[in-house]
């Protein structure tokens, strides 16, 4: 059965057309009746296209601080740097077996170096900077380096990464590249970007196919060692083709796409959804040096005062902090709502009170409600599997399957486990055949481990709602995964002997909480109370 949402804003989005086929085994196949149109051969074709069609348009912008002007690179200049850096990549013999690894945060050089490798069929792998900058044992960083055996490792500057680079030095034979020309202990990226373009670049670019590996993105590692998810060119281009078919405003004459984004390129939301959205559609991405964290969001707000995004992306925690600022800053509120076509949240569920607050502020500023949309997927689905390309009635609607992607809903206890199949789904994990085999069912659907419910089982066009994990792990509203089993054990150990057991909570919230079952005997002993002391006295003793 197919239904059309009467609230669909046709000027922005395509109307969903979804069927749900119920099978004899109890499973439900959910898909779009809109066929996926032909995708680009590779993401390099997008860069080549926009360098011809809009050579002077700003592709990327960044700034060192809120006090300095934006440094930018046009599509034409970006392509020139990509081709020249690709000449160096080829000269060093980089390949899927010896890829480019990037340890630093988002930046123009980061983007151009990654694109240069991908342009000639060499995967890049952006590793979470936290593995280098916040770890003491560097175990996760070491495991990624050992798995990938990189041919080159890029950092924006060697000084902050000195300890991490020293820790992994025995594990690789890579050239260390720095974005800072003053780093004497590394090859400077500006020198690489000035490499004379080799005729081999055009040949290597022509040899790239949809099956060529574009990048490796690592899972969070919340349940163990991070896994390297293979991202092919087909995954990335088909995902953005589906996005263009659902976000139809992207291809309307005169459409302008400007985003200001902090989301890290070591994760699929920032790297594959947002960055590739800009590249595929000839937009402009201003790199936000802030983030929704204490002491850092002021930078994001300053950047919002400088750049007016046409689409705003964030995780729920980011919206929480933004709303607080919009309530007190009239000028920022006006500029934000006048410029944004809609807002997009993902990474975790958006609390309804934040949804309501954003709508209220929008009405105050411009007299209409700002559309709020979302999507759902994972690193393994690059990431788009469903998209809420309609006006949902409330927060939490993750939308419907994108064109070309099928969902299989499998009964699992009192939940419907959701599985995914389509050109956007990974072929597997790098050098992990057992993990790859275990990740798919006998029909080739990826077992993501999430559960969903229909907004209305009779009207699949009205979307799906995330219904938790089939297993026990969950996300905070920052998008951070919480490893429940690991944290429970660590919490009990930290509180020993006072905690008998712990229930870990916090799904969709801004922090983790423990529901503690006390060891009353230990509590009485610590407080110096007799065994006859009651529970309230034992746990309430100062």
At which residue positions do the language-model features occur?
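Conserved AMP-binding/adenylate-forming core of the ANL superfamily
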Residues: 35, 59-115, 132-142, 193-197, ...
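Conserved structural elements of the adenylate-forming
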Residues: 79, 83-85, 195-201, 210, ...
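Structural core segment of the AMP-binding/adenylate-forming
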Residues: 2-11, 119-192
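Conserved AMP-binding A3 loop
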Residues: 71-76, 205-206, 214-241
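Conserved pre-ATP/AMP-binding loop-to-beta segment of ANL
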Residues: 55-58, 176-178, 185, 191-218, ...
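Conserved ATP-binding/catalytic segment of the ANL
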Residues: 416-476
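Conserved AMP-binding/adenylation subdomain of ANL enzymes
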Residues: 237-258, 265-332
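Gly/Ser/Thr-rich phosphate-binding loop
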Residues: 281-283, 301, 310-313, 323-395, ...
């Amino acid at each position: 059965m197919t239904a059309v949402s009467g609230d669909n804003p046709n000027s922005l989005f395509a109307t969903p057309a979804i069927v749900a086929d119920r099978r004899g085994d109890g499973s439900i196949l959910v898909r779009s009746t809109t066929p996926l149109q032909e995708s680009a051969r590779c993401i390099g074709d997008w860069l080549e296209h926009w360098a011809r069609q809009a050579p002077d348009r700003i592709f990327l912008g960044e700034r060192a601080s809120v006090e300095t002007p934006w440094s930018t690179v046009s599509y034409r200049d970006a392509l020139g740097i990509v081709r020249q850096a690709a000449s160096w990549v080829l000269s060093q013999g980089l390949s899927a077996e010896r890829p480019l690894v990037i340890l630093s945060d988002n930046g123009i050089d980061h983007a151009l170096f990654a694109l240069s490798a991908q342009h000639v069929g060499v995967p890049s792998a952006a590793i979470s900077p936290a593995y280098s900058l916040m770890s003491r044992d560097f175990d996760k960083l070491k495991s990624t380096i050992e798995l990938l055996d990189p041919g080159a490792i890029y950092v924006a500057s060697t000084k902050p990464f000195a300890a991490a680079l020293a820790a992994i030095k025995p594990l690789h034979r890579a050239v260390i590249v720095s974005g800072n020309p003053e780093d004497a202990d590394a090859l400077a990226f500006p020198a690489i970007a000035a490499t004379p373009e080799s005729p081999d670049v055009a040949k290597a670019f022509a040899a790239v196919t949809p099956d060529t590996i574009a990048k490796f993105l690592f899972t969070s590692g919340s349940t163990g060692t991070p896994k390297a998810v293979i991202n092919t060119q087909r995954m990335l281009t088909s995902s953005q083709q589906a996005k263009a078919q659902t976000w139809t405003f992207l291809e309307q004459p005169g459409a302008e796409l400007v985003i200001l984004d902090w989301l890290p390129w070591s994760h699929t939301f920032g790297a594959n959804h947002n960055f590739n959205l800009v590249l595929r559609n000839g937009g402009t991405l201003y790199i936000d040096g802030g983030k929704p964290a204490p002491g850092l969001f002021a930078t994001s707000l300053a950047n919002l005062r400088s750049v007016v995004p046409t689409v705003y992306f964030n995780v729920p925690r980011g919206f929480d902090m933004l709303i607080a600022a919009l309530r007190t800053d009239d000028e920022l509120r006006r500029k934000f709502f006048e410029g944004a076509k809609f807002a997009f949240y993902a990474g975790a569920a958006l609390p309804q009170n934040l949804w309501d607050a954003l709508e209220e502020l929008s009405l105050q500023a411009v007299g209409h409600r700002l559309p709020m949309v979302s999507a759902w997927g994972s690193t393994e689905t690059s990431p788009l599997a469903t998209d809420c390309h309609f006006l949902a009635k409330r927060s939490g609607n993750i939308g419907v399957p994108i064109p070309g992607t099928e969902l299989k809903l499998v009964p699992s206890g009192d939940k419907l486990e959701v599985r995914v199949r389509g050109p956007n789904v990974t072929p597997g994990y790098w050098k992990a055949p057992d993990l790859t085999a275990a990740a798919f069912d006998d029909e080739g659907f990826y077992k993501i481990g999430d559960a969903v419910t229909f907004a209305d089982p009779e009207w699949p066009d009205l979307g799906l709602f995330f219904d938790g994990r089939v297993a026990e792990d969950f996300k905070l509203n920052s998008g951070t995964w919480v490893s429940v089993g690991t944290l429970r054990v660590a919490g009990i150990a930290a509180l020993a002997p006072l905690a008998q057991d712990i229930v870990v909570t916090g799904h969709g919230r801004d922090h983790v909480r423990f529901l503690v079952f006390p060891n009353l005997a230990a509590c009485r002993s610590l407080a110096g109370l007799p065994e006859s002391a009651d529970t309230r006295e034992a746990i309430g003793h100062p």
